[in-house]
Amino acid sequence: MESIEQQLIELRTTLRHHEYLYHVMDAPEIPDAEYDRLMRELRELETKHPELITPDSPTQRVGAAPLAAFSQIRHEVPMLSLDNVFDEESFLAFNKRVQDRLKSNEKVTWCCELKLDGLAVSILYENGVLVSAATRGDGTTGEDITSNVRTIRAIPLKLHGENIPARLEVRGEVFLPQAGFEKINEDARRTGGKVFANPRNAAAGSLRQLDPRITAKRPLTFFCYGVGVLEGGELPDTHLGRLMQFKAWGLPVSDRVTLCESAEEVLAFYHEVEKDRPTLGFDIDGVVIKVNSLAQQEQLGFVARAPRWAVAFKFPAQEQMTFVRDVEFQVGRTGAITPVARLEPVHVAGVLVSNATLHNADEIERLGLRIGDKVVIRRAGDVIPQVVNVVLSERPEDTREVVFPTHCPVCGSDVERVEGEAVARCTGGLICGAQRKESLKHFVSRRAMDVDGMGDKIIDQLVEKEYVHTPADLFKLTAVKLTGLERMGPKSAQNVVNALEKAKETTFARFLYALGIREVGEATAAGLAAYFGTLEALEAASIEELQKVPDVGIVVASHVHNFFAEESNRNVISELLAEGVHWPEPIVINAEEIDSPFAGKTVVLTGSLSQMSRDDAKARLVELGAKVAGSVSKKTDLVIAGEAAGSKLAKAQELGIEVIDETEMLRLLGS
């Protein structure tokens, strides 16, 4: 059996290794939850054997040594970490320790904040002017990132207002909103650059660039949460008061900071934030709970690496470790070959996960993934679980290479990867059963032709029995033929036939979207329909003419042009029209002639609406001369935010785009 000393040495060595990967290399190998577990194990052993605690134990310090590439800044006041709790019982025990240690009947109130998942920084202002900025580093010495911090627009270079201290060190978190993270990775995949595993890594990598011009291109932002050095001035005597003073001086503070009068209110805040977490637009991994009174904070003091007056109440882990048992390849409706990791099932954020996307061959190469590897799985909100990284230090000896197919796993056709694209595709087209199934499922979906009752299992059977080859074949189905399918009685079969008949009456935009042209989503389909008005005009359009449609670039224009240039596609369209698919004659809208607050504006809808469906809202906006887009960009004029608006709202706020709610939208629609 291992001695206690040997266990402590191994735990400290392991933790130091992972601290170095996390804080210095920005390349964590294990989930935060696993690091926390190892730290708890070490702390418990040291508590039982205090005589074995060493000054350099990870429990006695914060972080790791700074990179040599940056000059160093010594923190005048150490930047400490926080202790963690993971359940209500542990928080209530912390609450009791605070009450007992104060030894008075004085009421304790709590200032609660979001625990942002970014990079802790210290920013020094002298006479209100930003003079330096540093990372946390090892808590005593950090890296000088002044030039990079100056590029972050959320951080003021000069404070404004009155009574600004002569020297004020503000502490906070630099982080990357989800929309910005997705854009960085999207660009990286397109250009062959570095793809980041999560927003925290992307924020750290962006902030620690040796070239500030690169940092300036990254949409980093910042919230402050504390103070270090304070000279030649005064601050309020409560933590919340200080944050509000920071805000008055122009420093960004989260609008979710909340004062709680009791432990029960703290728990209610925790659960409210946990519920809202998927729609915040940026990553958090818990809430931070601080004694609000500065006098009480001073009474409580510090332990070696953390204050006694604050704690991080962490959410259930969104990352876990498991093993890759196999890698299979799925074929989508456009022929895209997507590798999927088959995992040893593991619970992540309350959900049992057994599969995770690997995106493409480049991602497998970037990860260095082999079948049999131990990997970190991440699941955030409704995002499909993905492999974040491989735990190389625990790679088994019997792992196998992942071999990307050269032929379609479904139909055997050649797999082709166009130069400059990350995705490999099956060249089989509609002879490929997988593409045929997915194309038909898309065609009948609610936002396309909206064929009620035509579910995935029915489509699967229709393709497997060779009843249907193209979308036009759907409209030739009879109740008798449908009755031969599993779980399909005469009544259900007739209902499907009736739904197909009803679906023949559609709109030009829906019809275009249903065709499944590559990279033509609802918004693009609506734009094409509004611009060209008729199918004949669209079919005849050149690539140059197609690019005149708002938000249609060379890539989408080429996909549309190539689709209509293909004779088999034109034949399917002719068959659909012959089967009776039709839509109203176009109403040509000239935005300049419409007297409407939306005329000529590019509008984005986000979140859920309570008074009308999103489709109805889109249709009404288009009638009033708006161009409804699917994503927020610098070209967006207005964002309409419903309930639970997420990353699109965050991006709009980041870009300074006008935002209105559903009530204001309805008022303007009525005007």
Swiss-Prot record:
Stored Pfam families: BRCT, DNA_ligase_aden, DNA_ligase_OB, DNA_ligase_ZBD, HHH_2, HHH_5, Nlig-Ia
Positions of Zn(2+) binding: 408, 411, 426, 432
GO molecular function: DNA binding; DNA ligase (NAD+) activity; metal ion binding
Cellular component terms per the entry's GO annotation: cytosol
Cofactor annotation: Mg(2+); Mn(2+)
Keyword Ligase set for record: yes
Catalytic residues (positions): 115
EC top class named in words: ligase
Catalytic activity: NAD(+) + (deoxyribonucleotide)n-3'-hydroxyl + 5'-phospho-(deoxyribonucleotide)m = (deoxyribonucleotide)n+m + AMP + beta-nicotinamide D-nucleotide
BRCT domain: residues covered: 593-671
GO biological process: DNA repair; DNA replication
Binding site for NAD(+): 32-36, 81-82, 113, 136, 173, 290, 314
Keyword Transport in record: no
Keywords attached to this entry: DNA damage, DNA repair, DNA replication, Ligase, Magnesium, Manganese, Metal-binding, NAD, Zinc
Domain of life: Bacteria
EC number: 6.5.1.2
Family under the similarity heading: Belongs to the NAD-dependent DNA ligase family. LigA subfamily.
Function: DNA ligase that catalyzes the formation of phosphodiester linkages between 5'-phosphoryl and 3'-hydroxyl groups in double-stranded DNA using NAD as a coenzyme and as the energy source for the reaction. It is essential for DNA replication and repair of damaged DNA.
HAMAP family with a match to the protein in the record: DNA_ligase_A (MF_01588)
Protein's UniProt name: DNA ligase
Species: Escherichia coli O127:H6 (strain E2348/69 / EPEC)
